[in-house]
From Swiss-Prot:
Ligand binding (ATP): I10, G11, E12, G13, T14, Y15, G16, V17, V18, K33
GO cellular component: centrosome; cytoplasm; nucleus
Ranges of residues in domain Protein kinase: 4-287
Reactions listed under catalytic activity: L-seryl-[protein] + ATP = O-phospho-L-seryl-[protein] + ADP + H(+); L-threonyl-[protein] + ATP = O-phospho-L-threonyl-[protein] + ADP + H(+); [DNA-directed RNA polymerase] + ATP = phospho-[DNA-directed RNA polymerase] + ADP + H(+)
GO biological process: amacrine cell differentiation; cell division; G2/M transition of mitotic cell cycle; mitotic G2 DNA damage checkpoint signaling; regulation of mitotic cell cycle, embryonic; retinal cone cell differentiation; retinal rod cell differentiation
Record gene name: cdk1
Protein name (Swiss-Prot/TrEMBL): Cyclin-dependent kinase 1
Catalytic residues (UniProt): D128
EC number: 2.7.11.22, 2.7.11.23
């Protein structure tokens, strides 16, 4: 830790306080996340340190770079590259009655999918994607923060400040208590974020797990074994759920064109194996008019 100096507190993340800091000798500005774990007395589990150290290998222009993992008196500090703005703050800053430029929506979504595909290929899930952990710079680049931390530290029900962790972007298989889930959970979250990029409003903003599920069901219909094999045997599925018919996604997301709505619907398919993958989504016609050669990952993809 002696290599870094804290400049100021910039926020409170899922796992602890986040500081803006600087590397003393290089002057590099960084984000310093102090990880606060439930079992504070026992110190940091070695499994968590091992898991998180592997994340230093995730090097991609659309993934926030983990630069260092440091221990100080049984506290774990994660040192990340610094970006000053997150997507939530940016969406909140757009004046009332105005919306994000449709080409910027497209560019951001494509870059998010690039970052997710890169991590999924390396068997790393995010599990807690939301606008707050999508960071942006002033050149049109968006990067995913906190990839892999859920596996290292778990996804807490509450932030250490006791603020409830948002359920708005959580996939239905997670909400229904599925013991096994995989990469489609991140695609679902990305779909809900896609809708929010277009409308500035969360697509499904529940205030409890059951309210979250019912908001999804009211729009997409209550799932059953016909549309999602074995959903009725998931731990938190109840046969007493109201049986809503599928509503209209297009009436909730008015700012998307036909291709955009088609891609969104494919990202929000109930049955996880049938949900579009990040890689498949990147080849969807919605992106046909996006100049991918200008995107930060173009050099590594040979575009």
């Amino acid at each position: 830790m002696e290599d870094y100096v804290k400049i100021e507190k910039i926020g409170e993340g899922t796992y602890g306080v986040v500081y803006k800091g600087r590397h003393k000798s290089t002057g590099q500005v960084v984000a310093m996340k102090k990880i606060r774990l439930e079992s504070e007395e026992e110190g940091v589990p070695s499994t968590a340190v091992r898991e998180v150290s592997l994340l230093q290998e995730l090097k991609h222009p659309n993934v926030v770079r983990l630069l260092d993992v440091l221990m100080q008196e049984s506290r774990l500090y994660l040192i990340f590259e610094f970006l000053s703005m997150d997507l939530k703050k940016y969406l909140d800053s757009i004046p009332s009655g105005q919306y994000m430029d449709p080409m910027l929506v497209k560019s951001y979504l494509y870059q998010i999918l690039e970052g997710i595909y890169f991590c999924h290929r390396r068997r790393v899930l995010h599990r807690d994607l939301k606008p707050q952990n999508l960071l942006i710079d002033n050149k049109g680049v968006i990067k995913l923060a906190d990839f892999g931390l859920a596996r290292a530290f778990g996804v807490p029900v509450r932030v250490y400040t006791h603020e409830v962790v948002t359920l708005w972007y959580r996939a239905p298989e997670v909400l229904l208590g599925s013991p096994r889930y995989s990469t489609p959970v991140d695609v679902w979250s990305t779909g809900t974020i896609f809708a929010e990029l277009a409308t500035k409003k969360p697509l499904f903003h529940g205030d409890s797990e059951i309210d979250q599920l019912f908001r999804i069901f009211r729009t997409l219909g209550t799932p059953n074994n016909d549309v999602w094999p074995d959903v009725e045997s998931l731990p938190d599925y109840k046969n007493t759920f109201p049986k809503w018919k599928e509503g209209s996604l297009s009436s909730m997301v008015k700012n998307l064109d036909k291709n955009g709505l088609d891609l969104l619907a494919k990202m929000l398919i109930y049955n996880p194996p049938k949900r579009i993958s990040a890689r498949e989504a990147m080849t969807h016609p919605y992106f046909d008019d996006l100049d991918k050669s200008t995107l930060p990952a173009a050099c590594i993809n040979g575009v």
